[in-house]
Amino acid sequence: MYDEKKAERAVNFINNLKHTKGVWHGVPFDLLPWQDKIIRDIFGTVKDDGYRKYNTAYVEIPKKNGKSEIAAAIALYLTCADSEWGAEVYGCAADRQQASIVFDVAVDMVDQCPALKKRIKPIISQKRLVYMPFGSFYQVLSSEAFSKHGLNVHGVIFDELHAQPNRELFDVMTKGSGDARMQPLFFLITTAGTDRNSICYEVHQKADDILRGKKHDSTFYPVIYGIKDEDDWGLEENWYKANPSLGHTIPIKKVRDAFNSARENPAEENIFRQLRLNQWVKQSVRWMPMDIWDKCSFEVNPEKLKGRECYGGLDLSSTNDITAFVLVFPPTPTEKIDGAVALIMALDRSIRHESKESVYEKRGMRSFL
């Protein structure tokens, strides 16, 4: 069910705020179409009892599309205008500095809004904004404070979820912390990351499955802006598909320049794909484009490798598992160089905490660590 008045209330509140950065500083918000849709959908879609339908919103979008501004605006709305007495709203990120980015934007927005400025008491040393009429507050937390149990959460703004070192803060803030509230909102906003064993990729997969119709969760609102793995990363029409603010807050020339630099320097390609096009890449810096690497592939006959000079390389992961074990056979006057990947281990999240012995045994391998 859609409540136009509630949607309009949220949109009007945010549009009365002002931008805080660069040439946009002091300019009224005036939500862009993609932002307007997100706000209306989240705050205007309600259940039969009139409370919000969505308690989790996941927005994945490339850098410089205004993530911090929209996140700060939502934080202020939840704190001041959501008709919730004693609302506790938390800004979360991987570290205090990252979490402070959205908070600092919110502080600047308050400073530029006389109506909020006379009602909000900032406690900068604690990274806290107190909305005095309702006894509500917006407070910064980070992964360094993940043991903060016992919170009565009305709202969580999770900035750059992909940077979380583990899932502990996410679980503490989203699993049961808002049960005493009628319509808590967990607003997760991030750029794509590089770790496909992370909590962010787990949520990304859920969002993607819901968008594809493979899963259903009526309380989860997914938004993903980006290009697919099979899309041409050099096509400008794909840049617009991934960047809804392109041409508004992002000059197209900036993206063209970044693309040209990445095309000339393969080490920058994955950074461009991840940050500009919101692709989940395997690492932020790529030594060689994969299409060039793939051209070096040829069929290897193991029998012909017997007796040849050989060197082994073992790459250990940061935990207990093996990333890769590679055998390299130097070229001879009549033979090419050969490389054979003997072992690649990518442990599933579900077995990450098992002993390494049991993991290897289950996969028919012997542990030698």
Give the ranges of each region predicted by the language model.
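Metal-dependent catalytic core segments for phosphate chemistry
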Residues: T319-P331
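Conserved beta-strand and immediately adjacent loop positions that scaffold enzyme active sites
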Residues: E88, L185, A324-V326, V341
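C-terminal nuclease/phosphodiesterase catalytic domains that cleave nucleic-acid phosphodiester bonds
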Residues: L17-G22, N278-Q279, G312, T332-L369
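Acidic side chains
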Residues: D159-E160, D315, D321, D338
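Short, solvent-exposed secondary-structure capping/transition elements
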Residues: K47-Y51, I322, E354-S355
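Residue-level signal for alpha-helical context at structural boundaries
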Residues: A207, D294, N320, Y360-E361
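Phosphate/NTP-binding elements of NTP-utilizing enzymes
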Residues: M1-L314
